Amino acid sequence: MSSSPSIAQEFLATITPYVEYCQENYTKWYYFIPLVILSLNLISMLHTKYLERKFKAKPLAVYVQDYTFCLITPLVLIYYKSKGTVMQFACDLWDKNLIVSDPKAKTIGLKILGIPLIETKDPENVKAILATQFNDFSLGTRHDFLYSLLGDGIFTLDGAGWKHSRTMLRPQFAREQVSHVKLLEPHMQVLFKHIRKHHGQTFDIQELFFRLTVDSATEFLLGESAESLRDESVGLTPTTKDFDGRNEFADAFNYSQTNQAYRFLLQQMYWILNGSEFRKSIAIVHKFADHYVQKALELTDEDLEKKEGYVFLFELAKQTRDPKVLRDQLLNILVAGRDTTAGLLSFLFFELSRNPEIFAKLREEIENKFGLGQDARVEEISFETLKSCEYLKAVINETLRIYPSVPHNFRVATRNTTLPRGGGEGGLSPIAIKKGQVVMYTILATHRDKDIYGEDAYVFRPERWFEPETRKLGWAYVPFNGGPRICLGQQFALTEASYVTVRLLQEFGNLKQDPNTEYPPKLQNTLTLSLFEGAEVQMYLIL
């Protein structure tokens, strides 16, 4: 027999005197509030014990206690987020035992605003959530707190809606689409102008990368670049027609995403953060997208077929004429197309600027493959030749290991189920997961786990990707998620990041960082990861 009856008997023995007292003072209804809370906790406890017996699971090995009625945890997270250290705090929970008492624990239980959560960095649990037990988990509240900005798109939908979105979008990321690197070159020429104007002085290259990727992403998605890099500081003006809301789009998009990240921390209480500035930003973003959607809808099927070149929105308009569907999918892909690549490039050049030996080794490979400076053979850079650059791939892999684009995510159980690890001695036994329970997985912590990557897990070392152990990582390395929801735009992001890196190292022979720059850097986590304080670097021309 289970221990549940003894738990119940002990509970009843504890509360019986209290119940008798409440009966004598029945007019004072508030005496019953603690009784209700205790009863609900007992029911939850008994349900957990029942599931553990049913699934042959063990109790969670590590549970974080919050003695402030679960109110302090979200405040702590919001504080650290405002300082750019929330993701470092998430890693320190495990590595420095800030809250987790067992240094070997990879799965813990905690509560936020009274809501029980599971937090894991265990690759086996990540594999279960994303792949082997995919149908046991859904996006939960993600649709609710992202809907106001992204609507019903591939990143917010579950079930049949998600499958339909994926079927509709998959052809748009076929190899022939993502391999057209030559479309990036005009944007690179403008980027070069911005870097040269600093004459070797310190500047924030992250800000330029975000402008570069929004320009290239809008050209790919809309057929018309936002041309945010073309400004008076480099003697250029946009060549495309201006319209109301265009100039405000980038700032509004950034603000709305930042606000969404805070809503994520509050989980079911996300609706608290819905201020006027947030709503105004969303309206600007929607107006920007609607402008292009309307232009696409004004084209007949015959017009669309006659269009030369590839434009994501036009191809999508051949499948649906619903303006909301077009806007929602467009914004979902724009988040990934702009932010993922910009973040990757920013972290890559941040690390190269403080690791001159890695920078030199990468330039040597690029010189051998494509030449440098006046001898650069730009016409030889292609999807195929970029894939043959082994050290470049290692540098990108290492960047995505230490700084994964989506460092923290969650799912919600759709049924009573289990996770393979986290219970019993050493946390190696299965644990029971209740229907509706939130399970968070922190890929940033997985990618920096010393049990997996060794004592130098926090060190930027691309050479590890040539070692036999690293080639057997499996679910310990998932920079683009995994399973059925693996990122459709993975090759798009990797190809663009590779091309930009090669072209910058062909053009600039020196890359430095202020020796007083803080390390590890503070991290900004909105829907994707970026540098909280930018990437301040110095770049010099090849002479």
UniProtKB/Swiss-Prot annotation:
Membrane topology recorded in Swiss-Prot or TrEMBL: Single-pass membrane protein
Induction record: By various alkanes.
UniProt superkingdom: Eukaryota
UniProt cross-references to InterPro entries, sorted A to Z: Cyt_P450 (IPR001128), Cyt_P450_CS (IPR017972), Cyt_P450_E_CYP52_ascomycetes (IPR002974), Cyt_P450_E_CYP52_fungi (IPR047146), Cyt_P450_E_grp-II (IPR002402), Cyt_P450_sf (IPR036396)
KW Transferase (keyword) present: no
Needed co-factor(s): heme
SUPFAM superfamilies, per the entry: Cytochrome P450
Record has Endoplasmic reticulum as a keyword: yes
Topology Cytoplasmic: residue spans: 49-543
GO cellular component, one term: endoplasmic reticulum membrane
Lumenal side: 1-28
One MF annotation (Gene Ontology) recorded for this entry: oxidoreductase activity, acting on paired donors, with incorporation or reduction of molecular oxygen, reduced flavin or flavoprotein as one donor, and incorporation of one atom of oxygen
Binding site for heme: C487
Pfam families (alphabetical): p450
EC number: 1.14.14.-
Segments crossing the lipid bilayer: 29-48
Annotated localization: Endoplasmic reticulum membrane
Keywords: Endoplasmic reticulum, Heme, Iron, Membrane, Metal-binding, Monooxygenase, Oxidoreductase, Transmembrane, Transmembrane helix
EC category: oxidoreductase
Family: Belongs to the cytochrome P450 family.
Function, in words: Together with an NADPH cytochrome P450 the enzyme system catalyzes the terminal hydroxylation as the first step in the assimilation of alkanes and fatty acids.
Protein name as annotated: Cytochrome P450 52A1
Top-level taxonomy: Eukaryota, Fungi, Dikarya, Ascomycota, Saccharomycotina
Gene name in the database record: CYP52A1
